[in-house]
Amino acid sequence: MAGETIVNLLDLDAEGLVAYCGSLGEKAFRAKQLQRWIHQYNAADFDGMTDLAKSLREKLKGRAVIGTPDILSDHVSADGTRKWLINVGNGNAVETVFIPEETRGTLCVSSQAGCAVNCRFCSTGKQGFSRNLSTGEIVGQLRMAEFALRASLGRAPGPNGKAERVITNVVMMGMGEPLLNYSAVVPAMRLMLDDNAYGLSRRRVTLSTSGVVPMMDRLGAELPVALAVSLHAPNDALRDELVPLNKKHPLRELMAACQRYLKVAPRDFITFEYCMLDGVNDTEAHARELLAVTRDVPCKFNLIPFNPFPESGLVRSKTEQIKRFAQVLIDAGVVTTIRKTRGDDIDAACGQLAGAVKDRTRLAERTGASKIIEVRAV
């Protein structure tokens, strides 16, 4: 075993775990047993995996680990939203947010430390991009949150029956652009869908993208889950300013990709997310332009009141203006919702996932600040 690379079993989806067990001389069914222990029973070590042969447990010791997130903080908002801040090393942290509702519980999962897309209205992009998260770091957010929430409710670990599951929906809408970390995100989502792990349906796992068109096509071919697109502007000139990726994949190309995706998607519509910015993209004329640009894509709109942060120079649209904008869309027969701001008192609201621990080098480069780790009070 000397010199062997230690494997984090959270990094392995079902196929990867079968291959790993095979490398140890074990049969494929052992992979399912391991997967259930890790993802359904929250096993922290191998000794407690009582239906595994002792010889296999001994093989795993020293060769494999079950990685667990390094939680820096755990905060609960007045509205019940819960945010965990997770250390991912080198002065970086990512955030995981649970949003409880009457009939469901939604977990917002991060895929990168920082983000390279740098949307103008999103605080995460202002810290720059540090690195991609691993599969284990992504699915580990779901594992950590599910069992922490169960513990708070007095529910024991075990198979994820509908009556016991706390997290019913996962949205890949946290820090980062998921499709720019495709090789780690897709295995993580496979585990979310796997009946030997979390057993979520494809309709209940949503990936949000700013519009990485080639990877949208690949996702549709390999693992079509529900799709949300961060749109935020009704024309290329404005979207170029708000979502710089638009310069590479403009609206016509993006709309065509949405049409292709719908041919294989588990839902018959795309959700378009639209951050409402006062005097920038929120007029009734913008709404009519938005209807025109999306007319060939079955869709619904989710209007998001902007959550201000100092570096943006932007202001949230007034409530009445958001309602007028929404009414134009509704009058055209398009399902439109206005997102209720949740968790903003703990900086967990949409667009606020900047991480309280910031990469020292990038922070210094961007602000000229001294090289310290900055921790923001929450």
UniProtKB/Swiss-Prot annotation:
GO terms for molecular function: 4 iron, 4 sulfur cluster binding; metal ion binding; rRNA (adenine(2503)-C2-)-methyltransferase activity; rRNA binding; tRNA (adenine(37)-C2)-methyltransferase activity; tRNA binding. The keyword Transmembrane does not apply. Residues 101-345 form the Radical SAM core domain. Its EC number is 2.1.1.192. The active site is at E95 (proton acceptor), C350 (s-methylcysteine intermediate). It holds the Pfam family Radical_SAM. Binds 1 [4Fe-4S] cluster. The cluster is coordinated with 3 cysteines and an exchangeable S-adenosyl-L-methionine. The keyword Ligase does not apply. It is found in: Cytoplasm. Keywords: 4Fe-4S, Cytoplasm, Disulfide bond, Iron, Iron-sulfur, Metal-binding, Methyltransferase, rRNA processing, S-adenosyl-L-methionine, Transferase, tRNA processing. One of its GO terms (biological process) is rRNA base methylation. S-adenosyl-L-methionine binds at G176, E177, S208, S230, L231, H232, N307. Gene3D superfamilies: 1.10.150.530, Aldolase class I. Disulfide bonds join C108-C350. It catalyses: adenosine(2503) in 23S rRNA + 2 reduced [2Fe-2S]-[ferredoxin] + 2 S-adenosyl-L-methionine = 2-methyladenosine(2503) in 23S rRNA + 5'-deoxyadenosine + L-methionine + 2 oxidized [2Fe-2S]-[ferredoxin] + S-adenosyl-L-homocysteine; adenosine(37) in tRNA + 2 reduced [2Fe-2S]-[ferredoxin] + 2 S-adenosyl-L-methionine = 2-methyladenosine(37) in tRNA + 5'-deoxyadenosine + L-methionine + 2 oxidized [2Fe-2S]-[ferredoxin] + S-adenosyl-L-homocysteine. Its main location: cytoplasm. Its cofactor is [4Fe-4S] cluster. PANTHER family: 23S RRNA METHYLTRANSFERASE (PTHR30544), RADICAL SAM CORE DOMAIN-CONTAINING PROTEIN (PTHR30544:SF5). Specifically methylates position 2 of adenine 2503 in 23S rRNA and position 2 of adenine 37 in tRNAs. m2A2503 modification seems to play a crucial role in the proofreading step occurring at the peptidyl transferase center and thus would serve to optimize ribosomal fidelity. Reaction proceeds by a ping-pong mechanism involving intermediate methylation of a conserved cysteine residue. Belongs to the radical SAM superfamily. RlmN family. This is Dual-specificity RNA methyltransferase RlmN.
